[in-house]
């Protein structure tokens, strides 16, 4: 952003705001919102296994039909906001990923290429070692790398050192920008992986705005921003 940027971002949702945060309802308020806000941050908009999900257990990256509306409605909302001078910020949840069972990730196709995360993209110490125990029982291989940050139980923590993870995430973020019309990202749970990856992902996506969910003391926040080569706020 330019120095001394004076814009204001609205969080366009709250927990379980499935009615108030429907894309059609937000779009209908575009004229009013444009009088006060420059950016609107919306929840993770990909389809989840649970139809009543707020989006923080992502399963599909490229299927944008969610609990808040259809992909068509989402694109319409973003386009309308843009016409009113409002940029839309995607909530990007890539520290972790939901699975069908323990290890099944969906295969998704965009622009003729198919993308799929694999069991070898899961950090070795996921879920405090429970995932490794299950993998041993099932004869499944995990990554040889340990988690770079905090663990998150319930979903698979991704190994962002994996070339496949990097390829999938970069394609996903390009999709959010080029296909859906988002202009920037709010990264969820950035304490779970190195900030250096955020720098790489932002460079690949060519976004205008980035902020990471890093709630902590000044030193920790500063160190995380430095890890991104100052390519993200926090």
Indicate residue ranges for each PLM-predicted region.
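First exposed extracellular module after export/assembly in secreted or surface-exposed proteins
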Residues: 22, 79, 109-117, 131, ...
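Substrate-binding cleft of carbohydrate-active enzyme catalytic domains
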Residues: 39, 69-112
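Aromatic- and acidic-residue-enriched segments that line the glycan-binding/catalytic groove
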Residues: 51-60, 96-142, 203-204
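Soluble non-cytosolic domains of exported or imported proteins
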Residues: 4, 17-27, 68, 72, ...
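Short coil/turn segments at secondary-structure boundaries
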Residues: 62-68
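Polysaccharide-binding and catalytic clefts of secreted carbohydrate-active enzymes
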Residues: 45, 116-182, 190-192, 197-198, ...
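Active-site-proximal helices and loops of the catalytic beta/alpha 8
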Residues: 1-11, 15, 25-34, 44-57, ...
């Amino acid at each position: 952003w330019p120095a001394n940027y004076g814009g204001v971002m609205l969080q366009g949702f709250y927990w379980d705001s499935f009615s108030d945060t429907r894309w059609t309802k937000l779009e209908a308020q575009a004229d009013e919102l444009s009088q006060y806000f420059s950016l609107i941050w919306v929840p993770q908009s990909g389809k989840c296994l649970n139809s009543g999900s707020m989006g923080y257990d992502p399963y599909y990256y490229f299927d944008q039909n969610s609990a808040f509306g259809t992909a068509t409605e989402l694109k319409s909302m973003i386009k309308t906001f843009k016409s009113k001078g409002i940029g839309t910020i995607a909530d990007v949840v890539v520290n972790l990923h939901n699975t069908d069972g323990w290890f099944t990730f969906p295969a998704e196709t965009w622009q003729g290429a198919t993308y799929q995360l694999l069991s070898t993209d899961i950090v070795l110490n996921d879920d405090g070692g429970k995932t490794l125990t299950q993998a041993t029982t099932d004869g499944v291989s995990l990554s040889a790398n340990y988690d770079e940050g905090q663990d998150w139980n319930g979903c698979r923590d991704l190994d962002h050192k994996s070339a496949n993870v990097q390829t999938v995430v970069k394609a996903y973020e390009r999709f959010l920008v080029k296909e859906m019309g988002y202009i920037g990202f709010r990264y969820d749970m950035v304490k779970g992986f190195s900030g250096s990856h955020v720098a790489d992902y932002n460079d690949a996506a060519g976004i205008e705005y980035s902020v990471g969910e890093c709630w902590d003391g000044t030193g920790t926040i500063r160190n995380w921003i430095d890890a991104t080569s100052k390519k993200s706020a926090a």
